[in-house]
């Protein structure tokens, strides 16, 4: 299990964590090109098969076990009126997850993923980032380790998601800090903010950016992030250590791991993006990261729902890769 101790240690992780197995990728490509279909005709399904082959280090990868992790946290910046719901809703939604009543429960069941919901100090929100850093380095590293430690190293795929009132504000702040621009470039309605609510979000983010500009990736995570945001980053790193491909969800999870992208883009090489969120900042982030989402469903719920839906696409890709026969096996010659 990956154990992290400091931001300085994370800065060197890309040189020490496993990398894609290019021999397995090449073997999988050779198989793809011999199957009973025109080369490339399954489009991105073929790309997904090669991605899983490279990270699972086998020509014919399967998903025997898929894990979904949904991290929950609360945020001090909610004191600035950035959300229409009180923070108690985070508690209530966690209970809903645990009782099986949320969208993520249904989509994980449909996709064949085992869901775990992990709360991080819900009764102790982070600090208000308009007044100072949201977290200390020690608090951030602790949350990173919660995420890394939650990864089931026997899984073949990992979905990450989140729940936290106010965390669309956190995501917009992180995206603006990492990629540049203003709050207006990344702020959306979140859980239903009206024009006045959006104005409060923009004002809070602009104040946070003025206070915490010019920082490195992990320092930005501490200054503007949250515990569940850091835990998602930790899970991504823990999965990398175990060679488990990750399916990111929408805007919030992608903005979260942008802090890792800032540290070293290679830290996200094992990740695919499940869907393009309807939140306006998401496509801007994806374009800058150079990643294409698998689905466009106009979703913006979070929780890991878009990633869970995309897991079905990955499973379909691997079924084709492993179940189709080659031209030789079918007795077909050119």
Curated annotation (Swiss-Prot):
One of its GO terms (molecular function) is nicotinate-nucleotide-dimethylbenzimidazole phosphoribosyltransferase activity. Keywords: Cobalamin biosynthesis, Glycosyltransferase, Transferase. It is an enzyme of class 2 (transferase). The keyword Transferase applies. Pfam families: DBI_PRT. Gene3D superfamilies: 1.10.1610.10, 3.40.50.10210. Pathway: Nucleoside biosynthesis; alpha-ribazole biosynthesis; alpha-ribazole from 5,6-dimethylbenzimidazole: step 1/2. One of its GO terms (biological process) is cobalamin biosynthetic process. SUPFAM superfamilies: Nicotinate mononucleotide:5,6-dimethylbenzimidazole phosphoribosyltransferase (CobT). Catalyzes the synthesis of alpha-ribazole-5'-phosphate from nicotinate mononucleotide (NAMN) and 5,6-dimethylbenzimidazole (DMB). Belongs to the CobT family. This is Nicotinate-nucleotide--dimethylbenzimidazole phosphoribosyltransferase. The lineage of its organism: Bacteria, Pseudomonadati, Pseudomonadota, Alphaproteobacteria, Rhodobacterales.
């Amino acid at each position: 299990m990956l154990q992290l101790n400091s931001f300085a240690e994370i800065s060197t992780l890309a040189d020490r964590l496993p990398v894609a197995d290019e021999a397995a990728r090449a073997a999988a490509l050779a198989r793809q090109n011999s199957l009973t279909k025109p080369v490339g005709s399954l489009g991105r399904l073929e790309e997904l098969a090669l991605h899983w082959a490279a990270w699972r280090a086998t020509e014919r990868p399967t998903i025997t076990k898929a894990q979904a992790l949904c991290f929950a946290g609360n945020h001090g910046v909610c004191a600035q009126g950035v959300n229409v719901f009180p923070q108690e809703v985070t508690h209530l939604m966690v209970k809903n997850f645990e009782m099986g009543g949320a969208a993520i429960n249904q989509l994980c069941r449909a996709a064949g993923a085992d869901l775990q919901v992990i709360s991080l100090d819900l009764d102790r929100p982070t600090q208000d980032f308009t007044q100072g850093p949201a977290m200390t380095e020690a608090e951030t590293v602790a949350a990173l380790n919660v995420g890394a430690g939650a990864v089931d190293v026997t899984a073949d795929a990992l979905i990450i998601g989140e729940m936290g009132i106010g965390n669309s504000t956190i995501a917009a702040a992180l995206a603006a800090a990492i990629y540049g621009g203003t709050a207006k470039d990344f702020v959306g309605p979140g859980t239903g903010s009206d024009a006045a609510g959006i104005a409060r979000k923009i004002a809070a983010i602009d104040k946070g950016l003025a206070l915490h500009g010019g920082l490195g990736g992990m320092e930005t995570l501490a200054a503007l992030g949250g515990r569940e945001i850091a835990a998602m980053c930790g899970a991504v790193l823990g999965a990398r250590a175990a060679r488990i491909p990750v399916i990111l969800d929408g805007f919030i999870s992608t903005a979260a791991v942008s802090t890792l992208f800032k540290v070293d883009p290679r830290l996200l090489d094992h990740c695919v993006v499940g869907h393009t969120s309807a939140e306006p900042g998401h496509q801007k982030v994806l374009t800058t990261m150079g990643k294409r989402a698998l689905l466009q469903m106009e979703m913006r719920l979070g929780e890991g729902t878009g990633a869970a839906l995309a897991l079905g696409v990955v499973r379909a890709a691997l079924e084709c890769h492993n179940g189709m026969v080659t031209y030789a096996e079918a007795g077909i010659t050119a």
